[in-house]
Amino acid sequence: NISFRKELIKAWDKDMIYQERTVTMITLLMSYSLCISVILYRKMKVLLIDVYNYNKGGAETVCFNTGKLLEEHGHQVVYFTLKWEENNPSPYSKYFPESKETRKGPLKQVKNMVNYFYHFEAAKKMEQLIKDERPDIAHIHLMWGQITPSIFPVLRKYHIPILFTVHDYRIVCPAYTFRDGSGRICEDCKGKYFYKCFTHTCCKGSKVMSAVMAAEQYFRNAFF
């Protein structure tokens, strides 16, 4: 219940190291459970999806470690990320859609805003990758506000099973953190009142960013 979750968050706040280790352990167990299932089943082609193709943070570490473990057991791993200057070389880079940093042209900012809600190129590139590589399963790590849920209809179209490792609270909290602009523990959105992200200025102290994040959450819940 809500009160229990609040007490749990308070307890974690007393020891951030413990919190980080706990979250890391949960995500690792979820990822490795996929590996174990695949290893015990048959050799498969696994599509790993993340925003970045380099070690930007914990989600990428889990993603790449999962891929390494799968490959060690004879499975083929295909990566799908956005383009970034820091990306590691990849044989699948031709399928990577543009990111907000690599996109060019006079309409860059407009496209960046549109693609925060729905990334048309990501959907197109995902479909081409699936046609060429024919993965057996997709394992998503990060995608919010970057790759976006635009890839979901494509994965469903080709009947690709999806595993989603949740690395943060973005599914239910526009600000990712269950905290408002003042740092107070907050669950006021309750899965549907996302305008409160704007009224509480939850996202990095910015009304504009909070409004965009809330709007994206409404859009995603309405169409996906």
Show the residue positions of the predicted features.
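A short, histidine- and acid-enriched strand-loop-helix "catalytic/donor-clamping" loop
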Residues: 145-146, 166-176, 208
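N-terminal subdomain of nucleotide-sugar transferases
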Residues: 34-86, 131-133, 148-151, 158-161
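Membrane-proximal helix-turn-helix segments that form the acceptor-binding/catalytic region
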Residues: 157, 170, 185-224
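Short N-terminal targeting/anchoring amphipathic segment
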Residues: 128-146, 161-165
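A conserved catalytic-core segment of Leloir-type glycosyltransferases
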Residues: 73-137, 193-200
